[in-house]
Amino acid sequence: MEKLASLYHHHLATLQTRAQAVLARHKLDALLIHSGELLTVFLDDHDYPFKVNPQFKAWVPVTQVPNCWLWIDGVNPPKLWFYSPVDYWHSVAPVPESFWTAGVEIAVLRNADDIGQLLPAQRERVAYIGYAPQRAQDLGIRADNINPQGVLDYLHYHRAYKTDYELACMREAQKTAVIGHRAAHEAFLSGMSEFDINLAYLTATGHRDIDVPYGNIIALNEHAAVLHYTQLDHQVPSDVRSFLIDAGAEYNGYAADLTRTYSAQSDGAFAQLIKDLNQEMLALIDTMQAGVRYTDYHIQMHQRIAKLLKSHQLVRDISEEAMVEQGLTLPFLPHGLGHPLGLQVHDVAGFMQDDRGTHLAAPTQHPYLRCTRVLEPGMVMTIEPGIYFIESLLAPWREGECSQHFDWQKIDALKPFGGIRIEDNIVIHEGRVENMTRDLNLA
């Protein structure tokens, strides 16, 4: 914890510097960052699971407490009003005393509605950051200072550059996720259902379903062809062929996001395709470096997918270059190579080219790519290529002049396996790339 405290101290200094810059740019006195509020289920008496404002947990690792407030002026230590009511109906989080609290001024907020009396009276030039705009208006925040776009753009853009504290937290999240993946793989090998595999993952990670940073994808057989499959079937298929798990973990608000695909049989075309995709993915990561646009690596992955489709004779009698140019790889890999990762699984500002919000969209042919930025030291990205057998995407190719290039018999034989996705989390450094996932020996 001493090391984490030191890293957090420097992290806080970085955030303070960013705050000074954005406040000066927009002629503001302070940022008022809200952890969030509970939302009651319609016509009921209980609340939806609380999800904290990511801009709040960037400053303090308080992730499960609503009605908290941060006052940031970039000069004085951040002031945290920590919500700690007297309540015998619900558990109340204790007032924090941890590695990070020495750098933050903490005051206890017993009643959520009292915050208006406790904040500094002058709020004319204060920007509210949060998802309760009506609360901000009630506090006297000007409408144009409620989530002002220029402030958000600046904060989001710079979140791409992770501090050493953030990287330390993300490495810890990796460790937890890897433990979960190994437990889930064992559950798969023992013949469990999707539902029970998910329980094994959650038990191993110490997470609840509402704690994981993104809904776990636990897919057997054809279910792996649904990119965001979260159904969790209770029944084990009569013939188990494949298992895809896309699941992460969280540490101090920072996410891990890992995917692995397994074949029930160690030999056969599908098992070999997994091995070969894994090799191509690692080979691509070996080429990655700062100074190159992420889009370029996405295109290069499609070239590698073309190579695999040809070597496995799923597509034939056409060059790899022509396959990519004519879009024949797209039905097999319909999503992007990956995305920024951090406080959110799909972290912000993937398209921002500067801290004023200049937007560079994904290429027209690849609309689902989530990042077009030039890679720079401190960025954390997922690398998650796939090869899927999705009938709705393949169907248009069954007709027309390109149909002759597809070996439909081999493709249809692989459809019952659903598809493959393999995902690692990498850090861009000056002169090297750190693969946090493989460093923990998750094959």
From Swiss-Prot:
PROSITE patterns attached to this UniProt entry: PROLINE_PEPTIDASE (PS00491)
InterPro entries for the chain: Creatin/AminoP/Spt16_N, Creatinase/aminopeptidase-like, PepQ_N, Pept_M24, Peptidase_M24B_aminopep-P_CS, X-Pro_dipept-like, X_Pro_dipept
Binding annotation for Mn(2+) 1: D257, H339, E384, E423
Catalytic activity field: Xaa-L-Pro dipeptide + H2O = an L-alpha-amino acid + L-proline
Cofactor: Mn(2+)
Cofactor binding summary note: Binds 2 manganese ions per subunit.
GO terms under cellular component: cytosol
Disulfide bond annotation, renumbered to this chain: none
Top-rank taxon, per record: Bacteria
Single GO MF descriptor: proline dipeptidase activity
EC number: 3.4.13.9
Gene3D superfamilies (UniProt xref): Creatinase/methionine aminopeptidase superfamily, Creatinase/prolidase N-terminal domain
Enzyme class (EC, first level): hydrolase
Pfam families registered for this protein in UniProt: PepQ_N, Peptidase_M24
HAMAP family for this protein: X_Pro_dipeptid
Family listed: Belongs to the peptidase M24B family. Bacterial-type prolidase subfamily.
Functional note: Splits dipeptides with a prolyl residue in the C-terminal position.
Protein name: Xaa-Pro dipeptidase
